[in-house]
Amino acid sequence: MLKKYKMGFDIWAMVVFLIIMIPNFIWSAVPAPNDILRTESATKVIDTIGSIFQVLMIFTLCVFINPKRKKLSFTKTIIAMICCCVIYYCCWVFYYLGVTNWLVIMGLTIPPCMAFLFFAIDRKNYISIVPIAIFTVCHIVFGVVNFII
């Protein structure tokens, strides 16, 4: 499978990562009024596994390039990725307005993962699907266990 890819650097993968991380950078510097995300996690092992696969996800998205991918354009998958980012940003707005219900928590959890998945599919970067899937599962478990149940 690796033979189908070349090693390089996909600047757009890094751009997508940074766009998704901007609210996290803001959150690190400016706490929300009802900041439940700063509580101690009950899923530390899952969080560690998730962090490892998040790094692998970004690494595989940025480094492995499928030469058969098309030029980046507004395909259905890129539009889906953008929609996921918009939903994610909207959920951050609600979070900063003090809304911390299950819908907002899942909105902070699932859409960014789906954005990475749609980007990977569009770029034909199938190597990154496994780390994205594992990171997504860990991210959902973290959100559900720590903030919903």
Model regions and ranges:
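Membrane-interface helix-boundary motifs at transmembrane edges
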Residues: 2-8, 66-75, 122-129
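Alpha-helical transmembrane segments of multi-pass membrane proteins
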Residues: 19-32
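Membrane-interface helix termini and inter-helical loops of multi-pass transporters
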Residues: 31-43
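Short aromatic-rich membrane-water interface segments that cap or initiate transmembrane helices
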Residues: 40-52
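Hydrophobic, membrane-inserted alpha-helices
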Residues: 57-60, 87-88, 110-119, 135-139
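C-terminal halves and exits of single transmembrane alpha-helices
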Residues: 79-101
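Membrane-helix boundary connector in multi-pass membrane proteins
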Residues: 94-104, 114-131
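Terminal transmembrane helical module of multi-pass membrane proteins
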Residues: 124-149
